[in-house]
Amino acid sequence: MKKHILTALIFLFTFGVSQVIYKVPIHDTIDLGLPPFIERSIEMAEADSAEAIIFDIDTFGGRLDAATQIKDAILSANIPTIAFINRRAISAGALISLSC
């Protein structure tokens, strides 16, 4: 899995001098405050014409209703999304990771 992420990152960095890539943290417990943050992050990345968004995930999970809202926002994104599982993505974190 790490090879695939590394390959994707190398690919993104080699085809342009000034590419914009957003890194969005998803750490700790997933609660209802996180979906609006993720939605704003995606909107900002799209407005900045970012090449991609990398979600840095390290969570034991949390509320599945919040994770479902995040999943829907990621699937609706108009730019590529990448899940970087930085240690763990359990339960709701796995759902979010799989939506990228």
What is the role of each PLM region?
Residues 4-16:
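Sec-dependent N-terminal signal peptides
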Residues 18-100:
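Soluble extramembrane regions of membrane proteins in the secretory/endomembrane system
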